[in-house]
């Protein structure tokens, strides 16, 4: 019934959009359009993974804004609400426990969407339970959530809260087998969660992770830098407040790592420069930390090299799952690329 209701809403949304005069469509704000696209993509989750997973979306509370624009307003100091997706394999038994994957999405001002459907299918097939938070700053929920961005800050705690929600509220989740994995900005959040909450995760994978925000400001575009210096965010440039940008960079708290970690990067990455990730690797080595990493040489796909639908990308992901599986012990680990691809693409 829930699936049918979502399909009906989807059809209504598309019909309404198509029937609007061009001038009206043009007047839709960016946030209104993002909200519309989010609702459509939410329906697609049921189409893409609903055959093997129970799909749900919950509302959680994270800490208050790190900086209030109006300290005397009625909402000042209130916890911030955010959404989180939950994917549970349909094969689970209520009297058993299963490992949990915490999956922070990639992108600045982005959201968890069906770009990752094939990877969610791969995780579900191994009988992982997955939680994926649309943490503060995510798109698809209006200007309020968007403007609450806290890059490298309390967004990390939002993701950690989603972890705790699953452990505390689902008896089928094994709290001793919780892993975290993500790419790009999600890789950065993976690192920060491992560094900020040592011992709370059994292991982690960080793919092409943003690692040094100060360095990043040196090669990023002006539009990217303005996201950070905007009044609703840091409100200052890195030149004006180096300490604040340092606080948001995983490269600095590397000494706190206690849990198994795997890092992947690519020399042809056109988003997170390999030099930035190399700085993270060097910092961990300098602290004498035991971890694993691999620097791929001009792998096809650049920033997305190990998230593609190609056979080669599937091979790389199989190695990632083998690493995670060492510590999380899923019930149905993949034995081959063929098994992985059948899980992701059905054939």
Where do the language-model regions lie?
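Hydrophobic core residues within well-ordered beta-strands of beta-rich domains
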Residues: 80, 98-100, 129
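Short amphipathic alpha-helix adjacent to the substrate-entry channel of hydrolases
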Residues: 113-133
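Membrane-interface helix-loop junctions at the exits of transmembrane helices
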Residues: 21, 134-135
């Amino acid at each position: 019934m829930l699936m049918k209701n979502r399909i009906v809403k989807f059809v209504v949304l598309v019909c309404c959009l198509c029937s609007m005069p061009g001038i009206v469509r043009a007047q839709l704000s960016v946030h209104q359009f993002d909200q519309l696209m989010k609702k459509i993509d939410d329906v697609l989750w049921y189409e893409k993974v609903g055959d093997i997973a129970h799909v749900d979306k919950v509302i959680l509370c994270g800490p208050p804004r790190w900086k209030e624009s109006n300290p005397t307003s009625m909402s000042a100091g209130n916890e911030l609400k955010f959404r989180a997706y939950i994917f549970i394999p349909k094969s689970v038994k209520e009297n058993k426990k299963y490992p949990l994957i915490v999956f922070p999405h990639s992108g600045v001002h982005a959201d968890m969407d069906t770009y990752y459907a094939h990877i969610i299918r791969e995780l579900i097939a191994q009988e992982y339970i997955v939680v994926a938070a649309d943490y503060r700053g995510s798109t698809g929920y209006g200007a309020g959530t968007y403007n609450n961005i806290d890059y490298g800050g309390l967004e990390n705690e939002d993701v950690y809260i989603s972890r705790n929600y699953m452990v505390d509220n689902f008896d089928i989740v094994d709290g001793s087998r919780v892993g975290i994995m993500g790419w790009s900005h999600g890789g950065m959040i993976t690192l920060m969660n491992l560094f900020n909450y040592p011992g709370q995760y059994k292991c982690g994978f960080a793919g092409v992770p943003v690692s040094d925000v100060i360095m990043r400001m040196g090669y990023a575009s002006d539009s990217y830098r303005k996201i950070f210096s905007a009044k609703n965010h840091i409100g200052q440039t890195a030149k004006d407040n180096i300490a604040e940008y340092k606080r948001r960079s995983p490269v600095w708290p590397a000494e706190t790592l206690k849990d198994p970690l795997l890092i992947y990067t690519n020399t042809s990455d056109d988003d997170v420069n390999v030099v930035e990730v190399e700085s993270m690797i060097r910092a961990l080595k300098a602290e004498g930390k035991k971890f694993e990493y691999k620097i791929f040489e001009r792998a096809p796909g650049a920033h997305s090299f190990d998230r593609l639908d190609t056979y080669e990308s599937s091979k790389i992901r199989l190695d990632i799952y083998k690493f995670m599986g060492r510590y999380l012990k899923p019930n149905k680990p993949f034995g081959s690329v063929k098994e992985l691809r059948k899980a992701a693409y059905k054939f």
